[in-house]
Amino acid sequence: MNGMCWIASYPKAGGHWLRCMLTSYVTGEPVETWPGIQAGVPHLEGLLRDGEAPSADPDEQVLLATHFTADRPVLRFYRESTAKVVCLIRNPRDAMLSLMRMKGIPPEDVEACRKIAETFIADEGFSSVRIWAGEGSWPENIRSWTDSVHESFPNAAVLAVRYEDLRKDPEGELWKVVDFLELGGRDGVADAVANCTLERMREMEERSKLLGLETTGLMTRGGKQLPFVGKGGQRKSLKFMGDDIEKAYADLLHGETDFAHYARLYGYAE
């Protein structure tokens, strides 16, 4: 199968993990360094930053990841050549908490945590974070790659994958992705999962730092690079920031907004 195959996800949804497993599956080898993930399943934003971009009409299958919403102008070049989309979706509650950890903000710094939570709830996503660009709000991103995807990519087939299901049954869910993308048979799926556990990815991240290779962790003002790979926490309470934060988030989940709609649709309206 020729054409563009997108691994689309909102930031902090587990995209690096899925890309690592796909890279290991395709190559049949462990991913030894952080740049190996980018080499295996490139992130479009990283390519654009380096002045590169895939062909708009590839004569082979191309796996490409992005946090962009599907309707971003830069993606119009791939309108006709996009064949498949894997949309990776994570509980927005946990994505928000993952951002706090990524920024090196401990739960004890309640004021800083509250600021991120209040902004996330108000924006329904990360638009004010200024780490990424073009990702839109959480519901905008999901809608663009699922319900509205054919407005941007009329020929695309779509597979939605929940991060939580990938954590619960990584072999089963990775096989669904591999089969959907027509990458090959089931042989190699178990090895790809074993090669990309969170522990292995932490080791890979640290090894890459020691080798002076680029990783994704943010830099502190003191020049220390924070770890990118966390523990993949799920369904954590927001009450450590105050009952008002938990209530504000609950109100967002149970409103009549697109955020509430997609939270209900994917099982996050707890």
Swiss-Prot record:
GO terms for biological process: antibiotic biosynthetic process. Changing residue 101 to A: Almost no change in activity. Its EC number is 2.8.2.36. It catalyses: desulfo-A47934 + 3'-phosphoadenylyl sulfate = A47934 + adenosine 3',5'-bisphosphate + H(+). Changing residue 132 to F: Almost loss of activity. Disruption phenotype: Deletion mutant produces desulfo-A47934 but not A47934. GO terms for molecular function: sulfotransferase activity. Transmembrane segments: none annotated. Keywords: Antibiotic biosynthesis, Transferase. The keyword Cell division does not apply. The active site is at residue 67. Changing residue 43 to A: 80% decrease in activity. The keyword Hydrolase does not apply. 3'-phosphoadenylyl sulfate binds at residues 12-17, 90, 98-101, 163, 196-198. Substrate binds at residues 43-46, 132. Pathway: Antibiotic biosynthesis. Homodimer. Belongs to the sulfotransferase 1 family. Catalyzes the sulfonation of desulfo-A47934, the final step of A47934 biosynthesis. Also has weak activity in vitro with teicoplanin aglycone and teicoplanin. This is Desulfo-A47934 sulfotransferase. It comes from Streptomyces toyocaensis.
